[in-house]
Amino acid sequence: MKQLLDFLPLVIFFAVYKFFDIYIASGALIAATALQLVISYLLYKKLEKMHLITFVMVTVFGSLTLILHDDSFIKWKVTIVYALFAIALGVSQIMNKPLLKSMLGKELIVEDKIWARVTWYWVSFFVVCGLVNIYVAFSLSQETWVNFKVFGLTALTLINTVLTVVYLFKNMSEEDRKELK
């Protein structure tokens, strides 16, 4: 259920874009992200920081898109969110308080050097995706960008998540791996 909830705003944005335009889709994205927060709170009695950050970014950049009737803002939102994630991960690693380890370290027990590699891998991933988003958003058609945002970035993120889990699993002790099964 939680994973479906994570994709709700993206699905609504895409569907509304296909039937209307980027501006109505941006408004729908704002509403869907707000709805995501409400549903998440009702179901889990808490709000995740990532959802809150995303909501603020969607609201700010979506509103600018609507008010100024300029789709550049909603396109930049993707890159800025990725940059914030990269910065948060990088700073947490530099401060020896890796976010990924704090989120997953209880279930996936690996050495700190492995968490560092995974963290820097994700920092690099977010930076590259942010840069590619800029290229696609401002060099190709709006429809190509929407498809890239919805399908390309989502697929890349899912693939990288699977690769990360496999890498972490391979670097776990045999005993810890057995406990997961």
From Swiss-Prot:
Protein location: Cell inner membrane
InterPro entries: YciB (IPR006008)
Membrane topology, record value: Multi-pass membrane protein
Keyword Membrane part of the UniProt annotation: yes
Domain of life: Bacteria
Transmembrane feature ranges: 10-30, 50-70, 72-92, 118-138, 148-168
Role according to the record: Plays a role in cell envelope biogenesis, maintenance of cell envelope integrity and membrane homeostasis.
Family from the record: Belongs to the YciB family.
Protein name: Inner membrane-spanning protein YciB
Organism encoding this protein: Shewanella pealeana (strain ATCC 700345 / ANG-SQ1)
Gene: yciB
